[in-house]
């Protein structure tokens, strides 16, 4: 009987050990699976988030590039218009405002120019999207960010300066044209010597036509265009934009 009890006790101890060992091993194994699963989920989620942020940054930079291209076209248009004012101003100043010493055909080509009032505008909606998003903090290239904010500041300065010229032109030329008689208006529209007799008899107009020739400092306009181009090229290179 004693031997039988010892045999039963030994078997029971083996069963307990086996059960105990299985429980510990199973717990560790299950815990490891859970931990690994959490890590995989976390890493996978992080990779998805990073990939999504990368795509969002690239899409936003593409919008900024397109916006700068549009601003570049507006810049080119207003510069082309201003160059005509500049040419007329240079022509008149070079002849000391003695317009009858200038070939009449040369004056006629500018016959509508004195009534042209323009303004420069630019958009920064795409830049504002970037500034107001969390993406700004995710961009590691801080020099590029400075370049982008810098070019919009350049555009704003150019806008103020260019529109300052056309505001001046508007203030002088609108009252001048409103004060003309019908006969004077007809002569102005022909653009020949008689038109410039009328224009240059007005002191404000005489002073204004001298302005465009030296309105901007040398190479300023070209530098603005170059800065825009450099910003566009930097974006295209950094983010592989087509």
Give the role of each language-model region.
Residues 38-59:
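Transmembrane signal-anchor/signal-peptide helices with a preference for the extracytoplasmic
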Residues 11-14, 19, 24:
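Transmembrane alpha-helices
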Residues 61-82:
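N-terminal alpha-helical signal peptides/signal-anchor transmembrane segments
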Residues 81-118:
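Extracytoplasmic/periplasmic/luminal assembly and interaction segments
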Residues 4, 51, 56, 136-139:
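Non-catalytic interaction surface on structured domains
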Residues 107-242:
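Soluble extracytoplasmic domains of inner/organellar membrane proteins
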Residues 1-8:
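Short, small-residue-biased leader/transition segments that mark boundaries at the very start
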Residues 21-35:
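N-terminal signal-anchor/signal peptide hydrophobic helix marking the start
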